[in-house]
Amino acid sequence: MSVKVFIDGSSGTTGLRIADRLAARPEIELLSISAEGRKDVNERASVINSADLAFLCLPDAASREVMPLLRPDVKVLDTSTAFRTDPAWDYGFPELKGQKEKIQNSCRVAVPGCYASGFISIARPLVELGLAPVDYPFSCTGLSGYSGGGKKMIAEYESPDRPAHSKIDAPKSYGLTLGHKHLPEMQKISGLAHTPAFVPVVCDYYSGMQVLVPLDLKLAGTTAGQVAEGIAAYYKDGATVSVHALNEPLPENGLYSNALSGSDRMELYLTVNAAGDQMMLISLFDNLGKGSSGAAVQCMNLMLDLNETEGLE
């Protein structure tokens, strides 16, 4: 027996990726809507209400507009920022403590933001395990492929009219007033007393993400060994998250941000300096995989009582 699934917003980057993943799965029946119907919130709601599960791959306002029209028992996965800090919604990161069970029993799941996924994968266990205090002054830097900017940015970077040498050849930092839209979920889901200082950087490659979080071990009141042991134990049963050993030799003496492009896995790297008082914790993944459509499909599998990693790469 097939499961009826509808993707509201199937023409965007995330929606297209989800549709491609589900099209090859015989147990999934993808529902459709006319071009005219996509512009009618009541028509969209009608199709969603006929589904077993729906993905909302929409701007925040469009997601908020349709939600009051939906049956409470329809399973909904929202990929916007609209509901990620809403207490009525469950956060779609199954590897966090207790989160898998919540997602399995939920009708409302908010898919994490890409940068937020990387930061939370590090900060949440540090705070939860008492390896850093809730008021620790966290900071992080995130590097992303240009697909994270959606269709408009993809078109800019891949334009046939792009000059041989242009400013977008170089990495671009942005959000420099420290107000990125992922910050509320980064703080709340990690359990922090203060908003972290976060700077994102977009780079000239299609997909892949690296989030780097420095840790002052004296200020945190812990040791590198305790951090490595704690994080490894935290994710030991994680379906898509793995942890490398402390100071494991890095491939090519560093990490390329696009190393996991095309994958739905997340890999955490932990390094410590010679003095043993500073660490760098790095989350490596694909912004379109664990940072977006891969996480959404993983949550769908759990909500529909399917194999958690079915359809993942």
Feature locations, PLM:
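Short, hydrophobic/amphipathic alpha-helical packing segments
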Residues: 116-123, 179, 293, 297
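C-terminal substrate-binding/catalytic lobe of Rossmann-fold NAD(P)-dependent oxidoreductases
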Residues: 11-45, 137, 141-142, 146-281
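N-terminal Rossmann-like NAD(P) cofactor-binding subdomain of oxidoreductases
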Residues: 1-174, 272-274, 310-312
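Residue-level signal for short, function-critical loop segments
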Residues: 114, 219, 287
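PAPS/PAP-binding and catalytic site of the sulfotransferase fold
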Residues: 109, 227-230, 296
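C-terminal helical cap and adjacent loop that interface with cofactors, partners, or active-site loops
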Residues: 257-313
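Active-site catalytic microenvironments for nucleophilic, acid-base chemistry
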Residues: 125-129, 216, 299-306
